[in-house]
Amino acid sequence: MSRIAATFARLRDEGRAGLIPFVEAFDPDRETSATLLAGMAARGADLIEIGMPFTDPMADGPTIQQAGRRALRAGATLAGTLGLVRDFRAVNDTVPLILMGYLNPILSYGVERFTADAAAAGVDGVIVVDLPTEEADLLLPHLRQHRIDLIRLVAPTTTDERLPVVLNDSSGFVYYVSITGITGTRTASAEDLARDIPRVRKATDMPIAVGFGVRTPAQAATVARFADAAVVASALIDKLAAGLDADGKAPPAIVEAVLDDVAALAAAVRGERRAA
């Protein structure tokens, strides 16, 4: 059983949803992102998303765009991101890691090389935001060969007819984009989730994680009532960015504040029981 499957099986047994925080690799530097990765796992993250910095992150709002720019200035590369995963795996072999990003860096790195290196490093899944469903074969055979899940995005605008098509080649879990538009701009209501999550469940038996617009413990708790996991990204990056010093470095106090937020989010999702 994969780490992702084992984690969601455990969450089902515990009768609760999980927390998936996001960290941008190398934001604002390698050391800080490595500290955040380890700290998130220690503070209650059930899975962790790692952003692969890219020069043109079209689906991301200003927060993650700026994080990517900071990371690239710090020397972020795809090889460096895989190095972060490898270092994390040396001390934690249980928390699943999902790389999230765009197709171009993977193609530049080389698809077969990327999937082999990602598997060797300990990557469990990838979310490729701009990979069209009809072009999944660019990656899918290589990902399957190395037992890495291809996690697909679906949205409120994904029709009932389109859902099975998009999810046909997906594995691990479904990432439900709860809003239309770029990341971190607003949030879905309980009414939205109560309407939309059952519609997605009819199309798949995979777990459903909800992201794009989940910022607070209260919002994460709302997601936990309907979905299998809550994804929190922009709020954590905003907290980190607000505390950077004049040299763009992250003082220990702001790293600790971000991890305190992760702990609060984890407590919030643990306090909710899934709606029947």
Swiss-Prot record:
**Catalysed reactions, semicolon-separated:** (1S,2R)-1-C-(indol-3-yl)glycerol 3-phosphate + L-serine = D-glyceraldehyde 3-phosphate + L-tryptophan + H2O
Keywords, sorted A to Z = Amino-acid biosynthesis, Aromatic amino acid biosynthesis, Lyase, Tryptophan biosynthesis
Q: Pfam families, per this entry?
A: Trp_syntA
Where's the active site on this chain?
E49, D60
According to UniProt, this protein's pathway is: Amino-acid biosynthesis; L-tryptophan biosynthesis; L-tryptophan from chorismate: step 5/5
Highest taxon of the lineage: Bacteria
EC numbers on record:
4.2.1.20
Q: Name one GO cellular component term.
A: cytosol
Leader sequence segment: none
> Mind listing the GO molecular function terms for this protein?
tryptophan synthase activity
**Could you tell me which CDD domains the record lists for this protein?**
Tryptophan_synthase_alpha
Q: Which SUPFAM superfamilies match?
A: Ribulose-phoshate binding barrel
Q: Which family does it belong to?
A: Belongs to the TrpA family.
Describe the function of this protein: The alpha subunit is responsible for the aldol cleavage of indoleglycerol phosphate to indole and glyceraldehyde 3-phosphate.
- Subunit structure of this entry? Tetramer of two alpha and two beta chains.
HAMAP family, A to Z? Trp_synth_alpha
Protein's name in the database: Tryptophan synthase alpha chain
The record lists the organism as Acidiphilium cryptum (strain JF-5)
Q: What is the organism lineage in this UniProt record?
A: Bacteria, Pseudomonadati, Pseudomonadota, Alphaproteobacteria, Acetobacterales
Q: Which gene encodes it?
A: trpA
